[in-house]
From Swiss-Prot:
Its EC number is 2.7.4.3. GO terms for cellular component: cytoplasm. This is Adenylate kinase. Its main location: cytoplasm. ATP binds at G9, I10, P11, G12, V13, G14, K15, S16, T17. GO terms for molecular function: adenylate kinase activity; ATP binding. InterPro entries: Adenylate_kinase_AdkA, P-loop_NTPase. Belongs to the archaeal adenylate kinase family. Gene3D superfamilies: P-loop containing nucleotide triphosphate hydrolases. Keywords: ATP-binding, Cytoplasm, Kinase, Nucleotide-binding, Transferase. It catalyses: AMP + ATP = 2 ADP. It is found in: Cytoplasm.
């Protein structure tokens, strides 16, 4: 018995805010895990890096080993309590887009749901421009839409290898944050009967 919900969305879509508010309202006691944070902790323990920025420079084989180690750890945790896994479906690199969760990792995690938070490119661009605390790449609306399209494609690939259901939650300025939060709470509350 395990219940894993992967939540993803490109920077500026409102994923962190929606996640935080949904966790306050759900009946299930989820453990929120950021996949990248856990990978970084493992890399520091192994003496591979000192700073988060060094992670991208590790050889691909070492990164894959870290991903598998973290996936196994999360899979074990999910036997005790439901997991909400915050991660990137795709990662924009200077050379192209990288899948955030390779085949072996998604098979190990075996998620129940893959939730994608989306908004219009103009909304995302506006949020990024207003959020001066974050150092984000400047992208055009077309590039933002391409990234969201690739996230959907990645989610389909992940679902094919895990039988997860895909849920797309739209976080539009006019729709309201409240509706997006309620949609996520509905998904999270499904975990209650799994751990009863």
């Amino acid at each position: 018995m395990s219940f894993v919900v992967i939540i993803t969305g490109i920077p500026g879509v409102g994923k962190s805010t929606i996640t935080r508010l949904a966790l306050q309202r759900t009946k299930a006691k989820f453990k929120l895990i950021n996949f990248g944070d856990l990978m970084f902790e493992e890399a520091v323990k192994a003496g591979l890096v000192n700073h988060r920025d060094e992670m991208r420079k590790l050889p691909l084989e070492i990164q894959r080993d870290l991903q598998m180690k973290v996936a196994k750890k999360i899979s074990e945790m999910a036997r005790q309590q439901p997991i909400l896994l915050d991660t990137h479906a795709t990662i924009k690199t200077p050379h192209g887009y990288l899948l955030g969760l390779p085949y072996e990792v998604i098979k190990t995690l075996n998620p129940n749901f893959i939730v994608i938070i989306e908004a219009t490119p103009s909304e995302i661009l506006g949020r990024r421009l207003r959020d001066l605390k974050r150092d984000r790449d400047v992208e055009t609306e077309e590039q933002i839409q391409r990234h969201q399209d690739l996230n959907r494609a990645a989610a389909i690939a992940y679902a094919m290898h895990s039988n997860a259901l895909i849920k797309i939650i739209e976080n539009h300025e006019d729709k309201g944050l409240e509706e997006a939060v309620n949609e996520l709470v509905e998904i999270l509350d499904l975990a209650v009967k799994e751990y009863a």
